[in-house]
Amino acid sequence: MSENLRIQCITIDCHDPLRVAQFWAAALDWQITEQDEIEVVIELLDGSPEQGRIPDILFLKNPDKKAGKNRLHLDLRPLDQAAEVARLEALGAIKIEIGQSEYEETTWVVMADPEGNEFCVLRARA
């Protein structure tokens, strides 16, 4: 990674930053580290971008309605795909169809968080 430039955070626009941040903090087992009425930040429990770890996720209040499929999404690789999908559904995610069933050998499950932001749960680690 460049010492001159690093990714600080991935930003997700949403209507209710706290609600969406709470979902993702529970889903990823991260913690909320900053919070106000406009934005909420979650971080990995044992590291931060400042320590050269993965970026934070920033949930930013945005009044605009979601229009179409996300241009960027997270792919999650679990130990057990079926168990993880069930756990995420219990947290408030839903399975969605965005055309993935057109592929004969689909190995991922497309889901949406409580505000409809898409993400994928990949097949289990080999």
Tell where the protein language model's regions lie, with residue ranges.
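Vicinal oxygen chelate
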Residues: 7-16, 44, 62-88, 107-112
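A short acidic/small-residue loop/turn micro-motif
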Residues: 103, 125-126
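Core segments of cupin and vicinal oxygen chelate
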Residues: 2-4, 11-55, 84, 90, ...
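Short phosphate-binding/catalytic loops that engage adenosine nucleotides
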Residues: 93
